[in-house]
């Protein structure tokens, strides 16, 4: 059921500014969703005429772009950093924190993950944050290509889990119900005994729940750990095979004998 936004006392003409409009848009979107947010509805929420909003934002997309920029700088860029010295735990915390941030705030999910329209400035900031994360993974022992792929895999895993959960909730609120594969009727012990046994023990197929998210995340971390171990082992073998400069260089006595000959 859609919440009816509360009506504020009407503001004086010229008393609104872009920051107030963006803040009000976030408040209203929390009540009615991004899809149902409209300029006239926002005007009523803020207590101003809709022309006051159009003075700063010509269309809804312009307002949503401004909301996205603020959301990224305020929420997403505040997630924990990845540290080279403790890469596994900090990367795990980074992924969990990112997922929780989006899962706890559907407006952020709709703006950043589903709509995914970033200004050039915000895109550059996002690239700089990814650069730091990948640099620390390289310092931890991954090659540049592996560090890029590992961070990309974690990012896709987080985003996929959050978006799938968000779309599922939207579908349920619209009355569509669970997906066909998750419906109890689809899993018959007589025809799909393995599925029935697994789901009977709490496992869910393709569900963006905690169990599936953690399993996927640990698989990525385990793979990264193996790559770092292989890289470290290969570097050690090269160091053992490489002769030292002192071992190759002739001693002063040997040089003297060679000259005498």
Curated annotation (Swiss-Prot):
GO terms for molecular function: DNA-binding transcription factor activity; transcription cis-regulatory region binding. GO terms for biological process: negative regulation of DNA-templated transcription; regulation of DNA-templated transcription. Signal peptide: none annotated. The keyword Repeat does not apply. Residues 38-57 bind DNA. It is found in: Cytoplasm. Residues 15-75 form the HTH tetR-type domain. This is HTH-type transcriptional repressor Rv1353c. Residues 241-261 have a biased composition (Low complexity). Induction: Autoregulated. Keywords: Cytoplasm, DNA-binding, Repressor, Transcription, Transcription regulation. GO terms for cellular component: cytoplasm. Negatively regulates the expression of the efflux pump Rv0191 upon chloramphenicol exposure. Acts by binding to the Rv0191 promoter region. Residues 234-261 are annotated as: Disordered.
